[in-house]
């Protein structure tokens, strides 16, 4: 939970998945912690404290997008990652920048609904259990001559116990459940996303309240009934208010590939549309009000984190007004041989662990010797230097090439132990790493 984590705790959490790039991690951790700090400030001043947006600059494959992905999991807040290249200025074919906030609102509604349903889950489980028992043991009809049996009779209690122990999971029952409409997708013209959304929700509301009988296993029925009962206990209006407040106060937007909409001074053509997207982004980043189907959303306190490789353009190629909206600049460094080694050994879900787990399913024991790891790191670094620097992604290609034959014949090697040392790596990748023409096409 990000609001209770200190910046150093956030950084150490990111360290489990991303090697190096401490400047970027620190900037992101401080920005995340500042959301919590702002909430502790008294009201007149709190409104004036706006988030300091971040611009991450660095070559591809060094961890910019990965920082965003991991941040999304850490941040107990509405978070959306989008590519700036998807958008065009109003009037062109493409997405309108206001859809960023609408998508963020959808994310917040989903997140809030999940957390609200968790709170009422115990009550929902009890109600679902009673409904299931009513189907398994229909209550006897009262004809008027005798008292109806107690609801929790002995038989009912026996069935309740069996249900809780999972003994009835595979029993087939027929149940009346809410009918779901077949999902339909409505394609609207560019810039008319809001109207399209309204038409979609209008059609979605038409089938509400209808029920139909379905045959299913008790286990599946129990899950369905829990969801139905939880939905009854959640107040939709209250949920909307909470979600909108959460977007306005804690929302985070990660704008990837922002360098692709920067004007490249030496190139002509296409600049109008690029500048248009930047100008459309301006009010959103600075603070405006966007209309969504859940209500109006102010963007004043939404945190924007932008990132780009800036190979062909520079941050100064962005329009000055937009540059000013991203006061915190962080440069990410290219990866060294030591970084590649750390990526292969120190991260929580490193490639070496992934391949070991995959081959273990075929009963092949894969072991990586330190000199083998070092050689792999050297080859990945060397190919990046000679051909095209694609950062950590180069390791995917190198590892796949290294273990190609072993993966193919794994079933025949069942029960064997394979050690990947420097000699093994050189035997399979040595020629490719040395021959620049070959590595250009193969690695």
Swiss-Prot record:
Where mainly found?
Answer: cytoplasm
InterPro entries, per this entry?
Answer: AAA+_ATPase, ATP-dep_Clp_protease_ClpX, ATPase_AAA_core, Clp_ATPase_C, HslU, P-loop_NTPase
Q: Which GO terms describe its cellular component?
A: HslUV protease complex
Q: Which GO terms describe its molecular function?
A: ATP binding; ATP hydrolysis activity; peptidase activity; proteasome-activating activity
Give me the residues that bind ATP, please: 19, 61-66, 256, 321, 393
CDD domains with a match to the protein in the record = RecA-like_HslU
Localization per record: Cytoplasm
- This protein's UniProt keywords: ATP-binding, Chaperone, Cytoplasm, Nucleotide-binding, Stress response
One GO biological process term: proteolysis involved in protein catabolic process
Coiled coil segments of this chain: none
One matching Pfam family is AAA_2
Q: Which domain of life is it from?
A: Bacteria
Question: Subunit structure, briefly?
Answer: A double ring-shaped homohexamer of HslV is capped on each side by a ring-shaped HslU homohexamer. The assembly of the HslU/HslV complex is dependent on binding of ATP.
Q: What does this protein do?
A: ATPase subunit of a proteasome-like degradation complex; this subunit has chaperone activity. The binding of ATP and its subsequent hydrolysis by HslU are essential for unfolding of protein substrates subsequently hydrolyzed by HslV. HslU recognizes the N-terminal part of its protein substrates and unfolds these before they are guided to HslV for hydrolysis.
Family of this protein: Belongs to the ClpX chaperone family. HslU subfamily.
Report the protein name in the record.
Answer: ATP-dependent protease ATPase subunit HslU
> In which organism is this protein found?
Cupriavidus pinatubonensis (strain JMP 134 / LMG 1197) (Cupriavidus necator (strain JMP 134))
